[in-house]
Design a protein with these regions (language model features):
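Long, basic/Gly/Ser/Thr-rich N-terminal segments
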Residues: 1-160
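Pre-Walker A (Motif I) flank of P-loop NTPase domains
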Residues: 194-199
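N-terminal pre-Walker A segment at the start of P-loop NTPase domains
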Residues: 163-190
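Conserved nucleotide-sensing/catalytic segment adjacent to the nucleotide-binding pocket
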Residues: 223-226, 232-286, 291-294
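Hydrophobic positions on the alpha1 helix immediately C-terminal to the Walker A/P-loop
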Residues: 212
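ATP-dependent NMP and nucleoside kinases share a basic, alpha-helical "lid"
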Residues: 280-328
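P-loop (Walker A) phosphate-binding loop of NTP-binding proteins
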Residues: 204
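Conserved lysine of the Walker
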Residues: 209
């Protein structure tokens, strides 16, 4: 929390102790309460946006500013796995209903503690009079009074509101991390005119493809189809197949049973390949939906043709990739990834120009915000 407090102080030098305490509270508890009426929450968001005071966003070519002290135009870190998405992001094409869903879902999921809040307040006191040029004794008096009130949620100070016109929603930092993608999706859905919108989320092992797919499902109620359900069956595992870039997946079956049926009124039906039993197992049925996500390595296989409205590639640094796989799969499976699956993926990425042909390349680092 220390770094977050310093960065906010540098970016907003007219902050008062009240504003820093609010930031610490948000890092621990988010908005501080469940949203019991999402409809009313959306109406308040829309009214706040219509009464906006920040002026036109003026985003060139609709591009999002980068995260950081010089790029907090749309997203700013709040610590504790939370961030603030500013309502100015709606100027880019993000739908109010999408931002409200982020807010509602984040409020339902956040888990904080008074002990964590106290730790943040202690860090703030240690910074006052040094990195943060607020009087330490005055800050101590404010915090003591705040503790006496039972650590409530607080508003921004009048000075902060007058100087910076804060207008944002506090949400899980993952939403801020992928905000450019959500803007792009909202634009596509708005322009679709009743046809299906299909996107591919390809990329490196451990880059967060499945996590992103879950976020998309929660926000949009879309279908998600996983390439991992289409591993090769035993009769397909021949040397010639493994020498083929992108051959480590049953792309023929995926195209026939999923890609070719995305716009069918009957929906999609297929069997999942069970790696343990080495055979096709349960049947998945998915209705036709306006928005479909194809998730996983090999989702942009050239065999599928030009079937996507948007191609996304997720990447992550090698050291972080290794550590994520170790945490998720264990040391033994990490060796298999390094010796077998990652080299196959890399061969596919290179031979098929997957990264180069993607319209969005997103780096998914743990410490982005």
């Amino acid at each position: 929390m220390r770094e977050i407090l310093i960065r906010h102080w540098e970016h907003y030098p007219r902050m008062e102790a009240q504003d820093l305490v609010k930031l610490i509270y948000q890092s621990e508890f988010g908005g501080g309460h469940l949203i019991r009426d999402p409809g009313e929450s959306l109406r308040r968001l829309q009214a706040e946006y219509e009464a906006r005071e920040w002026g036109a966003a003026g985003a060139q070519n609709g591009a999002l500013a980068a995260s950081g002290p010089d790029g907090w135009k749309y997203v700013e870190p709040a610590g504790g796995g939370m961030c603030r998405i500013k309502l100015a992001a709606l100027d880019l094409g993000l739908e109010a209903v999408t931002l409200n869903r982020m807010f509602v879902r984040s409020a339902a999921e956040v888990k904080g503690s008074v002990s964590g809040l106290k730790a943040g307040l202690g860090e703030l006191l240690g910074l006052c009079g040094a990195e943060i040029s607020l009087d330490r004794e005055a800050a101590r008096a404010y915090i003591r009074a705040y503790e006496g009130e039972g650590y409530p949620a607080v508003s921004h100070s009048p000075a902060y509101r007058e100087a910076y016109h804060p207008s944002y929603r506090i949400v899980n930092a993952m939403y801020g991390r992928f905000l450019p993608l959500f803007v792009r999706i909202d634009r596509l859905l708005g322009e679709a005119g009743g046809r299906t919108v299909n996107i591919a989320v390809d990329g490196m092992s451990g880059s967060g493809k499945s996590t992103l797919a879950k976020l998309l499902t929660g926000l949009y109620g879309c279908n998600v189809f996983h390439m991992d359900d289409f591993f090769l069956q035993p009769f397909q595992r021949v040397p010639e197949r493994f020498r083929e870039p992108g051959g480590n997946v049953d792309y023929e079956r995926f195209k026939t049973q999923v890609i070719d049926c995305l716009d069918s009124p009957q929906g999609v039906e297929y069997q999942v390949y069970d790696c343990g039993a080495q055979r096709l197992s349960k049947t998945v049925r998915a209705p036709r939906r306006a928005f479909n996500v194809i998730e996983g390595s090999y989702s942009q296989h050239p065999y599928f043709g030009n079937c996507y409205d948007l191609r996304v590639f997720l990447e992550v640094g090698e050291d972080e990739q290794r550590e994520r796989i170790r945490r998720r799969n264990g040391e033994f499976m990490l060796r298999r990834f390094e010796e077998e699956w990652i080299p196959m993926e890399n061969a596919y990425f290179t031979a098929c120009n997957i990264r180069e042909n993607s319209q969005m390349v997103l780096t998914n680092r743990d410490q982005m915000l």
